[in-house]
Amino acid sequence: MAEEHRLQEPRLCANNCGFFGSTATQNLCSKCFRDLQHQEQNSSTAKHALTQSLAAVGAAASSSVSPPPPPPADSKEIVEAKSEKRAAAEPEEADGPPQDPKRCLTCRRRVGITGFRCRCGFVFCGTHRYAEQHECSFDFKRMGKDKIAKANPIVKADKLEKI
């Protein structure tokens, strides 16, 4: 019974950090064990990257005329998405002259913090805050249709079971 008690008594961390370790974590405390795993993971990824770069250099040396490999499909999609966002943002920036956000766009009255920001992106006073008053270019009908379409997806007949 004394031997069983000795097996279960806590052991100090193998790194002598002052905390207790367990046999499941190689006699390390949880923090030291986590650090050890992190170091092993970093070294394995570094070795993997090194072998890939050496293989790429060897392949490039053997065929100096070969074209560069195409980028992965995911990066193409990301580049296309970024270019679409930039294209969509450019016309908005080019539409109006640089404006002072503290003045109404229509009457140029100072509004300060009491100004109303419209969905078209401009600031208006209390008189011109409504879309009809400042000839808003924002398409509220399209926004409403998009919200309804998003909230109520189309139910396809082939997914429903017939009674």
UniProtKB/Swiss-Prot annotation:
* An annotated Gene Ontology molecular function: DNA binding
Q: Which of this chain's residues are annotated to bind Zn(2+) 3?
A: 118, 120, 134, 136
Q: Where is the composition biased (Basic and acidic residues)?
A: 74-89
Q: Which residues bind Zn(2+) 2?
A: 104, 107, 125, 128
Name the residues that bind Zn(2+) 1.
13, 17, 29, 32
Write out the ranges of the annotated region (Disordered). 57-101
Zinc finger regions (A20-type), where?
Answer: 7-41
Q: Which Pfam families match?
A: zf-A20, zf-AN1
What InterPro entries would the database entry show? AN1-like_Znf (IPR035896), AN1_A20_ZnFinger (IPR050652), Znf_A20 (IPR002653), Znf_AN1 (IPR000058)
Assigned keywords, A-Z? Metal-binding, Zinc, Zinc-finger
Q: Where on this chain are zinc fingers (AN1-type) annotated?
A: 98-144
One Gene Ontology term of the biological-process aspect is: response to heat
Role this protein plays: May be involved in environmental stress response.
Q: What is this protein called?
A: Zinc finger A20 and AN1 domain-containing stress-associated protein 3
Q: Which gene encodes it?
A: SAP3
